[in-house]
Amino acid sequence: MESLAALYKNHIVTLQERTRDVLARFQMDALLIHSGELVNVFLDDHPYPFKVNPQFKAWVPVTQVPNCWLLVDGVNKPKLWFYLPVDYWHNVEPLPTSFWTEEIDVIALPKADGIGSQLPAARGNIGYIGPVPERALGLGIAADKINPKGVIDYLHYYRAYKTDYELACMREAQKSAVNGHRAAYEAFQSGMSEFDINQAYLTATGHRDTDVPYSNIVALNEHASVLHYTKLDHRAPAEMRSFLLDAGAEYNGYAADLTRTWAAHGDNDFAHLIKDVNDEQLALISTMKAGTSYIDYHIQFHQRIAKLLRKHQLVTDMSEEAMVENDLTGPFMPHGIGHPLGLQVHDVAGFMQDDTGTHLAAPSKYPYLRCTRIIEPRMVLTIEPGIYFIESLLAPWREGPFSKHFNWQKIDAMKPFGGIRIEDNVVIHENSIENMTRDLKLA
């Protein structure tokens, strides 16, 4: 495999090309991309954890340093002003020398407010991309050039197509996340609490809570019925029944996003349902190919959910087609089949149909689907079906003409297990699908 430095060199060539195209389209001279700034908690001198501007880390793997600036014009070597204060109160990152610094002109910026003297004098035709518009105005950037929608739509649209460098980083993120999942499973088997399982995960991945790309979902038993459960009980439950872990990792700013569900005992109905959801997830992935709408795979999985509801006698005396048509599968899988993945966990432009930002909303029947694009080579997507036992979604079905088809006794017996989600991260290639997660033997 090519070195990361060689892959990064080609990555910058691609970003420069996109920059030339977008600047020509909007008749601009350059883009000034801001890493962001620390924001203090209200009435306090303590800042929130820093989260870098995703458009900044698309160019450079600098994710922990505020007050940095990139100037790119698609022609000249990108310039990075790297914040390097004299500060004995806080840790100061040294001026980077790494695999990527040959491609970037790195300049020390000793004072956060010193960027004004470093920039070209004529700034009326420079666009600002970043989270602090008032800073851009103070630098003389025109108001209509601050986060211009057309420019951002263009950049977001093409972020769906990962470079080889980006794919290499995402494969590395997978490795960390898989290590974490294995450690968390061992912690679950030893009877640990959600809090302690999370600690085991973070230790195995080498991440802090603020480093992971999203808040880990560490859900024992019925907590797995809360789709984004992040509470972390300190005390282990009296009886371990199930464990759902939705947790990722980050490498050079790129995310992994994996989910697994385990039963405490391998011979009950819930364990058999996990196996079947897993099998159907893999079967769906095996059918995927470039040129197909992502919506189609979401709809297909509802057909697979119907098959499982029938097989496990959770819904009875109704055809699978009728279950989907009448949305009896809806309360069991209320979320979408997945989403784009990259610099952000829910990566951008999932609804964009072209580089002008044309929006195609999710179908009204499935409003929580996060992607409506045609899948194409170099896209990275999650495939994360689930079956859940969520009373607030099931309750409306307990009355009315369809109630008799729900096997309420069996459904209620499943509720203490919470739910199931299985999530892999896949790369679309011209004639194949690469399952980064399963390639690392995460069962």
From Swiss-Prot:
Chain positions recorded as Mn(2+) 1 binding sites:
257, 339, 384, 423
Q: What keywords sit in the KW lines?
A: Dipeptidase, Hydrolase, Manganese, Metal-binding, Metalloprotease, Protease
Q: Which reaction does it catalyse?
A: Xaa-L-Pro dipeptide + H2O = an L-alpha-amino acid + L-proline
**Superkingdom of the source species:** Bacteria
Q: Which GO terms describe its biological process?
A: proteolysis
Question: One GO molecular-function annotation for this sequence?
Answer: metal ion binding
The residues that the entry says bind Mn(2+) 2 are 246, 257, 423
GO cellular component terms given for this protein: cytosol
PROSITE patterns associated with the record = PROLINE_PEPTIDASE
Q: Its function?
A: Splits dipeptides with a prolyl residue in the C-terminal position.
* Protein name per UniProt: Xaa-Pro dipeptidase
